[in-house]
Amino acid sequence: TRGGRAVDVTPLWTVDRPAALTVSAAGLGTTTNTEGGDVVVTARFGSLAASAAVRVVFAYTVVAPGAPADAPAAFPETATPGTDAARAPAWVYPANETVFPQNVYKVLFQWRRGTGNDRFRLTFESDRTRVSVVTDGAHPTCTMAGTGLGCFEPTLDVWRAIAAANPRGSVRVTLDAASSTAPGTFARASTLNIGF
């Protein structure tokens, strides 16, 4: 109140990354469920302004086209990787520490499948992101090449969820492999780091 009269002091809320977070007129922040990352939230009233940094951690699992809907069951959260070297997948592309432009999403991840594996999980993880993709490893390019490799190419939405949340940063990429005939046990490749 001022002079016994109520005065409206509702601030104007803004964010610098509305693709990750929106703020209502009442100041309630809501994630968009499309990407994560660091967001600066600012409240302005007249000539006054205050800002705060908010970190949005985006986590979700995608079942890639071609993989059965129950494919994630091959990788229970409570399981740990096995030690059978013959079953372990191995990265072919990209090389560790590869840096990609954020707007180039047609990256074809490629790996040796390991013995008996037909289910694969790629997890892209940082302090802002945890995106898991479960796939059967089939891709037309790899099939045509006849190499027998497992492959995955992110869609634009998946790539944006990974890259936009980590500008000038990096993510760890883990690759797990399992067999549909023995769900619950899986093997893991060495971890990759990729940057943007």
Question: How does the language model describe each region?
Answer:
Residues 87, 113-133:
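Solvent-exposed loop/turn segments flanking beta-strands in beta-repeat/beta-sandwich domains
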Residues 87-115, 151:
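Contiguous beta-strand segments within globular domains
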Residues 61-88:
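Proline/serine/threonine-rich low-complexity linkers at boundaries of modular beta-sandwich domains
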Residues 28, 139-170:
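Signal that preferentially marks extracellular ectodomain short beta-strand elements
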Residues 48-50, 177-185:
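Short acidic/polar inter-strand loop motif in beta-rich domains
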Residues 37-45, 166-179:
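Short, aromatic- and glycine-rich surface loops/edge beta-strands on solvent-exposed regions
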Residues 182-194:
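Extracellular fibronectin type III
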Residues 1-71, 117-119, 161-162:
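Extracytoplasmic soluble-region selector
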